[in-house]
UniProtKB/Swiss-Prot annotation:
Component of the CCAT-binding factor (CBF or HAP complex II), which consists of one copy each of HAP2, HAP3, HAP4 and HAP5. The assembly of the HAP2-HAP3-HAP5 heteromer (HAP complex I) occurs in a one-step pathway and its binding to DNA is a prerequisite for the association of HAP4. The gene is HAP3. Present with 2510 molecules/cell in log phase SD medium. This is Transcriptional activator HAP3. Residues 9-31 have a biased composition (Polar residues). PANTHER family: CCAAT-BINDING TRANSCRIPTION FACTOR-RELATED (PTHR11064), NUCLEAR TRANSCRIPTION FACTOR Y SUBUNIT BETA (PTHR11064:SF9). Keywords: Activator, DNA-binding, Nucleus, Transcription, Transcription regulation. Belongs to the NFYB/HAP3 subunit family. Residues 42-48 bind DNA. One of its GO terms (biological process) is positive regulation of transcription by RNA polymerase II. Its main location: nucleus. InterPro entries: CBFA_NFYB_domain, Histone-fold, Transc_fact_NFYB/HAP3, Transcrpt_fac_NFYB/HAP3_CS.
């Protein structure tokens, strides 16, 4: 899926009816388009928090910088996810997994990120297995 597909706003009668008839005016079309684009982005507060945690405590971040970063990281996520989705479709699968993301990062030229995420994914899976094991052991102890 490319970015134009996700931003497309149809003005067909069916879509106009689905949107409560509001899509007929150009102002409403603009609002619907903006909402759809906004829905694709990460919440600005989350982006701002990540930026703040990365920068020195005395650093200030402008609203424009936050909005720019919000759009950039959201586009990157969409780009990688789209590549992973295409891979899943080619394999006739419906669920994107961590390996799909890693392969997509490599395919898109983000090898450095893929290597770091591969390590993170292995550690995450290891912790999840340990957590599941502990929960299983607790369940065994509670059974009389």
């Amino acid at each position: 899926m490319n970015t134009n597909e996700s931003e497309h706003v149809s003005t067909s009668p069916e879509d106009t009816q689905e949107n409560g008839g509001n899509a007929s005016s150009s102002g409403s079309l603009q609002q619907i388009s903006t909402l759809r684009e906004q829905d694709r982005w990460l919440p600005i507060n989350n982006v701002a928090r990540l930026m703040k945690n990365t920068l020195p405590p005395s650093a200030k971040v402008s609203k424009d910088a936050k909005e720019c970063m919000q759009e950039c990281v959201s586009e990157l996520i969409s780009f990688v996810t789209s590549e992973a989705s295409d891979r899943c479709a080619a394999d006739k699968r419906k669920t994107i997994n961590g390996e799909d993301i890693l392969i997509s990062l490599h395919a898109l030229g983000f090898e450095n990120y893929a290597e770091v995420l591969k390590i993170y994914l292995a550690k995450y899976r290891q912790q999840q297995a340990l957590k599941n094991q502990l929960m299983y052991e607790q369940d065994d102890e509670e059974v009389p």
